[in-house]
């Protein structure tokens, strides 16, 4: 028999009754029932109930063991009586009668419980992550993460993609966040950067003639954490293809990712045909470029119903500024003054003046609008609004007015709030879509200049003609995001593989040809030696896993995450370098000036 085990703690069944076996694992629980000890023995695979009665030679050792001790048990498999069968356990029809117990490792008093799922302070959980990872839900999440990544790898292989590994030590590049810098010992005063993404390398692979690339790529960005983004590092399914249009990228990746979701969705419906929604349409209908399509509320422009109306607040805004629009946020079943007042109070808590609203009820056999707005604009306009929005008695509608560029985010939040309050969102499904036709440029209010809206390596729609002849802010990019349930799960584009177009695009944001050659020299040179049309995308593995396991934040699907202050409490990182290390790198720590 093997030194430590003949079976795992999930393997034994009724067919094994009568066998002498050996198990090893952690003591999950110890219970004393009238002098008979019951030990739940746990390993990575499951739990087996072990019985040690006073007549057993293993009883003396069994009396000493405590929770989370590691032990080896030899014993006889017996069938449980009918009234003690546990149908909730894979091994619930049998129990192991202990004949010998060997203690392999003792455990100190635990700083956090492993049994059950109680809430516990995050700093304790992260400092003792090796214990936290023993908890059932977190352990299961990590296993599922591995399975999801394996499924992605298989799917990409089945599509004819090959996995290539790109460098971790590379040059700094403007991907939209701060770089993690690594000082060079050999080249004093010079630094590598950890890659924010393998963007340039995967494009260089296409120039080198590798047709279909993918990689489970670690990415590093020195940015502030939030629920759907961890500090430090994250992982993405990075993809690139040669000789493709954006439609080719969508039709390749969409079925593969749909299959991954269906495999792990536990029966929840998954969108099979992902709609393509232009960016401008997504902003207008949903107030977001990451719309949650489980929410049935679709916003509409209703400016004409308030133009010249008796509601002077909106009417005067429309008359004084051609950019002003009025958007409607219809809320079916929300037709009560109490609900409308709650929504208005919420808007004020968000720093807004409030939300105009109308709610409809049945009066004398017909549907009539109620509320201050309805009185101000009159019965005819109120009825026209109801007809346009398809509302009935018992429904409501909220209104936001101004420059959409300034209010669309709030309107989107109001749409979400209304749906949450009215319980309109079906949370047991995965709704996917592609957001397409992103702006190529945007105006940077802080720096008062034109900047790239997203990926600077995207191909502008219209090519050189658009760059030379159009208002930069009107140019669209061959760029797209994949969205699931309100989360961006992928971003990609068709790349700009022309050196002339590349220089012209960067000129628009204030960078010269020499700047381009200095910052993106490898890519710029490569494009001068026959670059194929190419494009791709990257799916955020962490967010995909978070959605599939139903976790509330990324720490629940990550092995060893940092805390909100970007610290690894388990490994005590970051930590000071030694004087010798600093000297070898020709570095000196200069304390920052405190205000």
UniProtKB/Swiss-Prot annotation:
Subunit structure: Homodimer.
Site (Important for tRNA non-discrimination): 33
Family named by the database record: Belongs to the class-II aminoacyl-tRNA synthetase family. Type 1 subfamily.
Keyword Secreted applies: no
GO biological process: aspartyl-tRNA aminoacylation
Biological role stated in the UniProt entry: Aspartyl-tRNA synthetase with relaxed tRNA specificity since it is able to aspartylate not only its cognate tRNA(Asp) but also tRNA(Asn). Reaction proceeds in two steps: L-aspartate is first activated by ATP to form Asp-AMP and then transferred to the acceptor end of tRNA(Asp/Asn).
Alphabetically ordered keywords of this record: Aminoacyl-tRNA synthetase, ATP-binding, Cytoplasm, Ligase, Nucleotide-binding, Protein biosynthesis
Chief place where the protein resides: cytoplasm
Gene: aspS
Protein name listed in UniProt: Aspartate--tRNA(Asp/Asn) ligase
Pfam families, sorted: GAD (PF02938), tRNA-synt_2 (PF00152), tRNA_anti-codon (PF01336)
UniProt-listed Enzyme Commission number(s): 6.1.1.23
Keyword flag Membrane: no
Subcellular location, record wording: Cytoplasm
Binding positions (ATP): 221-223, 488, 540-543
Catalysed conversion reaction: tRNA(Asx) + L-aspartate + ATP = L-aspartyl-tRNA(Asx) + AMP + diphosphate
GO cellular component: cytoplasm
HAMAP family per the UniProt record, alphabetical: Asp_tRNA_synth_type1 (MF_00044)
Sample GO molecular function, one term: aspartate-tRNA ligase activity
